[in-house]
Design a protein with these regions (language model features):
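N-terminal membrane-insertion helices
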Residues: 143-154, 288, 292-296
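Small/aliphatic-rich secondary-structure junction motif
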Residues: 3, 12-37, 71-135, 162, ...
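Short secondary-structure boundary segments
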Residues: 33-34, 200, 276, 336-338, ...
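Active-site phosphate/pyrophosphate- and oxyanion-stabilizing loops and adjacent acidic/basic residues
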Residues: 216, 259-262, 297, 322, ...
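Charged helix-capping and loop-helix junction motifs
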Residues: 210-214, 289-293, 347-352
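Structural beta-alpha unit
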Residues: 4-5, 9-28, 51-55, 59-71, ...
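Intrinsically disordered or low-complexity boundary/linker segments at protein termini
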Residues: 36-92, 115-124, 164-168, 194-206, ...
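A short acidic, glycine-rich active-site loop
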Residues: 131-148
Length: 368
């Protein structure tokens, strides 16, 4: 039986509110050091929970706005969002999303956005569309073409489901007008998907034409869990990782991110290598090593399907990352991601960006 630990110390009213919030998510909560008959006699209340529920409790506390309306009937359950452009790399992403949906008894939502030709100054779908019918006719024609391509894309998925090539899940379709990255972010904010799965091209093609910038923009929003699926890989390889590289910030957000990883891919026996992110001077070298060691011990005790180890070096640049990849052969990278402002991104692009544009390894980016 898991021992109880103190999550927080609050006033009586706040402790009751937190207990209600946690119990609604299935967490057992005890209140200690308070006179429950007359709460005015107590200045503080310890909110205690089972130790194994700590990651979930931290996630709930850090994201109260996402859990407060959990009883809403309009809230979608276990939806996986797949932005598509009808290319092969977006089809690979859709196949991977079907497997995620099957594992978690959910559905997938295909999302395509098209640009108004009068605003974009170009034709996005095909060069054969005629805009001589006027602005209204052109928009109707463009939307009709978008829906036709979406229907064909969904039918291809259904055909492969029937043949047993990919799992059978419910497929929803959404077509909207707008800039792709803005449409994805707005849809995700409104529908809170469990995961966003995005296809990316090979590293060579991304470096050549900067394809993948839409994915980078979605990551910059920083509030969604995103799985990137590189073009050369198949779905099974992406969803059955054997060796995972986890970038650690050496704070409690690591526990949140590891718990998200385990909930998504915890049915596979995998090795997880914990590596230190480039950090500020708030940690000495010895303190950082102790913090990483404590994190490794905690994870080994609470996530039994995984075997945890620490990287022998701290990853500070792309060359160090490449050497580590050559040594271990990681097949999934997990990156806790903080939201960054535009200026800092321009001056010092984040590690997530560099991995997207410089490697062909699937990456799970988790907001913290």
């Amino acid at each position: 039986m898991s021992r109880f630990i103190t999550l927080a110390i609050h006033t009586y009213e706040k402790a009751l509110s937190l207990r209600t919030l946690l119990e609604n998510e299935g967490i057992n909560v005890e209140l200690h050091n308070v006179n429950l008959e007359d709460p005015r006699l107590s200045s503080g209340v310890r909110v205690r929970i089972p130790e194994h529920d700590l990651p979930l409790a931290l996630r709930i506390v850090e994201n109260r706005e996402l859990f407060a309306d959990n009883g809403s009937p309009d809230r979608p359950a276990h939806t996986v969002l797949v932005p598509v452009d009808f290319s092969e790399h977006s089809y690979n992403a859709a196949c991977a999303a079907c497997e995620v949906g099957r594992r978690h008894n959910g559905s997938i939502t295909l999302l395509y956005s098209y640009l108004d030709p009068y605003l974009a100054g170009k034709v996005q779908l095909t060069d054969t569309l005629s805009y001589e019918t006027g602005e209204r006719g052109a928009r109707q024609q463009l939307e009709g073409e978008a829906r036709r391509l979406m229907d064909n894309f969904a039918e291809r998925l259904r055909s492969h489901m029937k043949r047993g090539h990919i799992p059978i899940v419910k497929v929803n379709r959404e077509v909207a007008e707008g800039v792709p990255e803005d449409t994805i972010v707005d849809f995700a904010k409104a529908n809170t998907p469990r995961l966003i799965v995005m296809g990316t091209r090979s590293a060579e093609r991304k470096q050549a034409d900067m394809i993948g910038s839409v994915t980078a923009e979605v990551l910059d929003e920083g509030r969604f869990t995103v799985l990137t699926v590189p073009e050369p890989l198949d779905c099974e390889a992406v969803l059955s990782p054997r060796h995972i590289l986890f970038f650690s910030n050496l704070d409690q957000n690591d526990i949140l991110a590891i718990d998200t990883l385990y909930r998504l891919f915890g049915d596979n026996e995998s090795t997880v290598t914990l590596a230190q992110m480039p950090r500020k001077n708030r940690f000495s070298e010895s303190a950082a090593e102790k913090a990483l060691s404590r994190l490794t011990e905690y994870c080994a005790e609470n996530y039994k399907q995984y075997r945890f180890e620490t990287a022998p070096v701290r990853i500070t640049d792309d060359d160090e990352f490449s050497r580590l990849q050559d040594r271990y052969g990681f097949d999934l990278i997990v990156l806790p991601n903080r939201r960054r402002n535009a200026l800092s991104r321009l001056i010092n692009p984040g590690l997530a960006h560099r991995i997207i544009f410089g490697s062909d390894i699937p990456m799970l980016v988790i907001p913290v």
